[in-house]
């Protein structure tokens, strides 16, 4: 299991990203818009760079909700492959059945 501080750091990044998502999108739209003056686009770039690094969705790591495992995590279920197998075998995940042919 991952350290609790690492899991909490990722949760903090998720909350910061959700809070500043609209502001980032607005600034990026200004930067990409060619009809706006170069000076205004530059000021938007400066404002974007002043935002916290953790407000970018790139910094969020997809982790298992139960164990905090960073790799082998299924997005649909938000759990790792190991936990998915355990929960699936005891029937805790609705609609998930063991394959047989």
UniProtKB/Swiss-Prot annotation:
Alphabetized UniProt keyword annotations: Ribonucleoprotein, Ribosomal protein, RNA-binding, rRNA-binding
Q: Name one GO biological process term.
A: translation
Return the PROSITE patterns for the record.
RIBOSOMAL_S14
Q: Which domain of life is it from?
A: Bacteria
A Pfam family of this chain: Ribosomal_S14
Please provide one cellular component term from the Gene Ontology annotations of this protein. small ribosomal subunit
The answer to keyword RNA-binding applying to this record is yes
Q: What are the TM regions of this chain, as residue ranges?
A: none
Recorded GO MF terms: rRNA binding; structural constituent of ribosome
The UniProt subunit note reads as follows: Part of the 30S ribosomal subunit. Contacts proteins S3 and S10.
- What functional role does this protein have? Binds 16S rRNA, required for the assembly of 30S particles and may also be responsible for determining the conformation of the 16S rRNA at the A site.
Mind telling me which PANTHER family this protein's record contains? 30S RIBOSOMAL PROTEIN S14, SMALL RIBOSOMAL SUBUNIT PROTEIN US14M
**Family designation:** Belongs to the universal ribosomal protein uS14 family.
Q: What protein is this chain from?
A: Small ribosomal subunit protein uS14
Q: Which organism is it from?
A: Ehrlichia chaffeensis (strain ATCC CRL-10679 / Arkansas)
């Amino acid at each position: 299991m991952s350290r609790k501080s690492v899991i909490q750091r990722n949760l903090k990044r998720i909350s910061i990203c959700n809070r500043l998502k609209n502001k980032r999108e607005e600034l990026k739209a200004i930067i990409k818009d060619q009809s706006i003056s170069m000076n205004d686009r530059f000021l938007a770039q400066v404002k974007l760079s002043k935002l916290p690094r953790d407000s970018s969705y790139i910094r969020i790591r997809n982790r298992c909700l139960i164990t905090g495992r960073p790799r082998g995590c299924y997005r649909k279920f938000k759990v790792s492959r190991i936990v998915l197998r355990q929960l699936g075998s005891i029937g805790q995940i609705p609609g998930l059945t063991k394959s047989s042919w």
